[in-house]
């Protein structure tokens, strides 16, 4: 079942009827991360806020776990959807533990021992040792630490859906990269359905299973990062994702995109070939070929499956022609 479904969603604002979204239709699979990317005014945040009914659609249908959000009580709906924003929104008069558990306290039905155990579990999850951080106040935290607390608060009630509106946009480049890595790690553990707004195409390519490219309220393309880089639907998408940027392709396309089906094998005296994870980047694969001077890399596969290979020639071909 899709985690989130948009069907012909449109939105007009004000008496002038300004069209912010026009006939947007797509699905976000359960447990996946979908990045909404586009320039300012593309409709990304408007679309995201419709999921928890902070904004109502003018027309169309939005389903969460198969149920229309318009059939749900807005307050009850929001209690089951995590929400993380750029400004974090921590209460300055509350310590870290109080900030995290506030959503569960509002929902009710949690004992104090259960609240405390869940807070400690989430602090461990976001990389903040509870003994050191649970009694600190927001003013005593760095920007990155505040965002970790904000993420922990959004996960407090274990929601199936997580909405993230440019959560790392105000962080410096180093902290931003660290938070992106942390989110990838956390998502591998919790497997939430994530809808994430960003202006940063590299952030979108790094974090997303799917990337939805928005432009002037329309959905231009929905696809995996490799699809956008190698098969953009039009020039607007191509310019936005930088589909002619070879360095970007090396960093974000995976080795599995560059399988060399014509490789016949190394000479018997060449020794065993080095191995490569299918999700390693093309850059990692290319550097491994240079370091080892091997004629090919073996793509790791489950037992019993035939060996697949990546060569320097297949990497170059992929960059020139696009992933198969």
Residue spans for each PLM region:
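A short, proline-enriched helix->beta-strand linker immediately N-terminal to the Walker B motif
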Residues: 156-160
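Conserved ABC ATPase "signature" region
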Residues: 113-132
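Helix-to-loop junction immediately C-terminal to a conserved catalytic motif
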Residues: 52
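ABC ATPase "signature
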Residues: 222-223, 231, 309
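ABC ATPase NBD coupling module
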Residues: 68-82, 106, 112-113, 231-232
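Short helical segment in ABC ATPase nucleotide-binding domains corresponding to the A-loop/adjacent helical element
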Residues: 97-106, 116, 120
């Amino acid at each position: 079942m899709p985690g989130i479904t948009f069907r012909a969603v449109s939105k007009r604002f004000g008496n002038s009827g300004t069209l912010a979204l026009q006939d947007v239709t797509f699905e976000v699979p359960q447990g996946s991360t979908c990045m909404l990317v586009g320039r300012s005014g593309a409709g990304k945040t408007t679309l995201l806020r419709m999921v928890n009914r902070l904004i109502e659609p003018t027309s169309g249908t939005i389903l969460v776990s198969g149920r229309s959000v318009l059939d749900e009580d807005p307050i009850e709906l929001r209690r089951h959807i995590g929400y993380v924003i750029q400004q974090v929104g921590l209460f300055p008069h509350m310590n870290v533990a109080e900030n995290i558990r506030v959503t569960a306290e509002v929902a009710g039905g949690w004992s104090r021992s259960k609240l405390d155990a869940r807070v400690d579990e989430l602090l461990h999850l976001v990389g903040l040792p509870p003994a050191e951080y649970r009694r600190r106040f927001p003013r005593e935290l760095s920007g990155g630490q505040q965002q970790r607390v904000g993420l922990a608060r959004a996960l407090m009630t274990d929601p199936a859906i997580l909405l993230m509106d440019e959560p790392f946009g105000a962080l410096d480049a180093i902290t931003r990269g660290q938070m992106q890595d942390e989110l990838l790690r956390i998502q591998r553990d919790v497997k939430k359905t994530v809808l994430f707004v960003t202006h940063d195409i590299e952030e979108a390519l790094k974090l997303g299973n799917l990337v939805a490219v928005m432009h002037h309220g329309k959905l231009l393309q929905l696809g995996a990062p490799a699809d956008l880089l190698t098969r953009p639907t039009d020039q607007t998408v191509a310019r936005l994702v930088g589909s002619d940027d070879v360095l970007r392709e090396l960093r974000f396309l995976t080795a599995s995109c560059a399988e060399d089906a014509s490789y016949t094998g190394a000479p018997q005296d060449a020794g065993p070939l080095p191995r490569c994870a299918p999700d390693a980047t093309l850059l990692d694969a290319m550097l491994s070929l240079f370091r080892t001077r091997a004629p090919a890399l073996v793509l790791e596969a489950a037992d019993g499956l035939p060996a697949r290979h990546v060569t320097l020639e297949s990497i170059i071909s992929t960059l020139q022609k696009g992933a198969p």
